[in-house]
């Protein structure tokens, strides 16, 4: 007799970010995450991509990574500038840890249409 599982057969859902399974973040929560990136000494990086290519292609940098940046308001203004320039793109904030040479965190700030 074949085994009948009681667990549903759920499809894996692709997510774009670290917090993809949580409710969308508020503006204050986004600011707190950016402040955390800066406090850890990580380099803020802004990336963007059209939604149609978000899973198949590399995301493009908005300018260069902000190495050594300590000003939260400057990072937020660059996020907003990227969103204004590419309103239909996903815009993601990445905290790059130079010591481990990896992403410390990544989350979508603006979702494209």
Swiss-Prot record:
GO terms for molecular function: ribulose-bisphosphate carboxylase activity. The keyword Iron-sulfur does not apply. InterPro entries: RuBisCO_ssu (IPR024681), RuBisCO_ssu_dom (IPR000894), RuBisCO_ssu_sf (IPR036385). Transmembrane segments: none annotated. GO terms for cellular component: carboxysome. It comes from the Bacteria. It is found in: Carboxysome. GO terms for biological process: photorespiration; reductive pentose-phosphate cycle. Keywords: Bacterial microcompartment, Calvin cycle, Carbon dioxide fixation, Carboxysome, Photorespiration, Photosynthesis. The keyword GTP-binding does not apply. Belongs to the RuBisCO small chain family. The basic functional RuBisCO is composed of a large chain homodimer in a 'head-to-tail' conformation. In form I RuBisCO this homodimer is arranged in a barrel-like tetramer with the small subunits forming a tetrameric 'cap' on each end of the 'barrel'. Heterohexadecamer of 8 large and 8 small subunits. Forms a CsoS2-CsoS1-RuBisCO complex. RuBisCO catalyzes two reactions: the carboxylation of D-ribulose 1,5-bisphosphate, the primary event in carbon dioxide fixation, as well as the oxidative fragmentation of the pentose substrate in the photorespiration process. Both reactions occur simultaneously and in competition at the same active site. Although the small subunit is not catalytic it is essential for maximal activity. This is Ribulose bisphosphate carboxylase small subunit. It comes from Prochlorococcus marinus (strain MIT 9313). The gene is cbbS.
